[in-house]
């Protein structure tokens, strides 16, 4: 299955928090979108790997993505090495995305920075013809494929974006997908331990960050991204 955009997160809910309004906007524009979760989030304080599997499936259905895959790397302990790179290369070559969205380069959770670098390196290596890979559900050797762009969404830390996507009209769907992770976010009836993301303030911050990013570009809501290399445009008139 050829995808236009592949969004990758270290944990289930990373993509929803970081860029799901952008994804739903692109789906509305007819693009084919997929999500890859690197881990099942099994080390999370609240919930279990099994409940997060269920929640991620529900969130994917809400967003309307074409496919969601979990790599089942070890939460907290996966590393950016050849073994993990090759497994991710197989997925990149399988889905052939034009654009990859992934974790923030620097963030509070160590898996976010690790995941960011792992994805960036795998995207580069995926384009090398001398790396041979086979995918279990495909016949023959895979062809090299390098995404045209890798962008990083913004997570816990305040990071100045290199560009902001106008996601006005798509925040309701984003919040619905985020709140599908019932074990992770604010629930006044939960008896599980509090975490940095389980407070009402954190849930509210999703909306007010989007409003503030939107304010910066003169729209209602925005999602910000950073880049690894300069963004090229054909004409000044392509800039909004």
Where are each of the predicted segments found?
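Active-site rim/loop-helix segments in enzyme catalytic domains that contact anionic ligands
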Residues: 1-95, 226, 236-238
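Metal-dependent de-N-acetylase/amidase catalytic core
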Residues: 2-6, 82-240
């Amino acid at each position: 299955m050829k995808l236009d955009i592949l969004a990758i997160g270290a944990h289930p809910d990373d993509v929803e928090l970081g860029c799901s309004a952008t994804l739903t906007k692109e789906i509305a524009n007819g693009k084919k979108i997929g999500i890859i979760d690197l881990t099942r989030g099994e080390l999370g304080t609240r919930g279990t790997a099994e409940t997060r599997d269920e929640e991620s499936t529900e969130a994917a259905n809400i967003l309307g993505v074409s496919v969601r895959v979990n790599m089942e790397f070890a939460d907290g302990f996966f590393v950016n090495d050849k073994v993990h790179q090759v497994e991710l290369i197989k997925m990149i070559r399988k889905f052939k995305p034009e654009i990859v969205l992934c974790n923030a380069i620097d963030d509070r959770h160590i898996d976010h920075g690790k995941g960011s670098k792992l994805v960036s390196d795998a995207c580069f290596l995926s384009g090398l013809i001398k790396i041979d890979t086979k995918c279990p559900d495909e016949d023959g050797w895979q062809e090299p494929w390098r995404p045209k762009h890798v962008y990083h969404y913004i997570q816990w830390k305040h990071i100045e974006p290199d560009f902001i996507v106008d996601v006005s009209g798509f925040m309701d769907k984003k919040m619905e997908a985020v709140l599908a992770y019932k074990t992770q976010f604010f629930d006044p009836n939960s008896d599980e331990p509090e975490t940095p993301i389980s407070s009402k303030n954190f849930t509210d911050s999703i909306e007010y960050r989007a409003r503030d990013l939107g304010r910066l570009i003169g729209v209602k809501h925005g999602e910000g991204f950073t880049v690894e290399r300069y963004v090229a445009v054909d004409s000044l008139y392509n800039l909004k």
